[in-house]
């Protein structure tokens, strides 16, 4: 594909852009996209849950290009929202626990994209990412989101379980990344 495709990206030519990065046929590998649990203060028992639009956009672009894609919305999957106390009793967790998320990861996952939006949650998300890599050592972990975009060198240094970071708007960067790895 043309290496300058991002500069030439025009919504009127979306199909031709996607066709340049189509998934291989009959490939059973999966791209899993995950929004992890949210962190709340110790005295908070719920927080409004928004839709994971970033992951939805990523998933939509990848699926349109033929990649098998699954989304785990650990913050918003449970209705009503589940809030539990952290194991160290210092904060609350809204959404699925680390263990519940690990159980939802498809064993055919080749790439796991994880949304790291808020720096204030990094202290809890980093050990979770390390748990993923321990259970699934062959999964390629890609971080995205505001936190990842702001301080990528720090994240890669502090969490070697993360293999790559995609900065900024990730829809087409993740598509090209996936194409090059598949």
Model-predicted segments: where are they?
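Residues that mark the start of a beta-strand
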Residues: 28-30, 68
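Short glycine-rich His-centered loop
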Residues: 30-49, 140
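Short catalytic helix/loop segments, enriched in acidic residues and glycine
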Residues: 48-63
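Glycine-rich beta-alpha loop elements in corrinoid/cobalamin-binding modules
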Residues: 61-182
């Amino acid at each position: 594909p043309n290496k300058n495709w991002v500069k030439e990206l025009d919504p009127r030519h979306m199909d031709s852009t996607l066709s340049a990065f189509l998934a291989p046929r009959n490939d059973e590998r999966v791209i899993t996209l995950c929004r992890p649990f949210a962190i709340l203060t110790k005295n908070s028992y719920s927080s409004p849950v928004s839709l994971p639009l970033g992951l939805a956009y990523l998933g939509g672009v990848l699926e349109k290009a033929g990649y098998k894609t699954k989304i785990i919305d650990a913050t918003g999957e449970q209705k009503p929202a589940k809030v539990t106390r952290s194991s160290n009793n210092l904060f609350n967790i809204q959404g699925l626990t680390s263990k519940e998320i690990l159980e939802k990861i498809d064993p055919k996952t080749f790439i796991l994209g994880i949304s790291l939006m808020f720096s204030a949650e990094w202290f809890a998300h980093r050990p979770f990412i390390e748990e993923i890599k321990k259970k699934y050592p062959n999964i390629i972990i890609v971080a995205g989101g505001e936190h990842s975009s702001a301080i990528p060198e720090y994240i890669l240094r502090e969490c070697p379980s993360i293999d790559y970071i995609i900065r900024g708007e990730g829809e087409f960067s993740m598509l090209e990344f996936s194409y090059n790895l598949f």
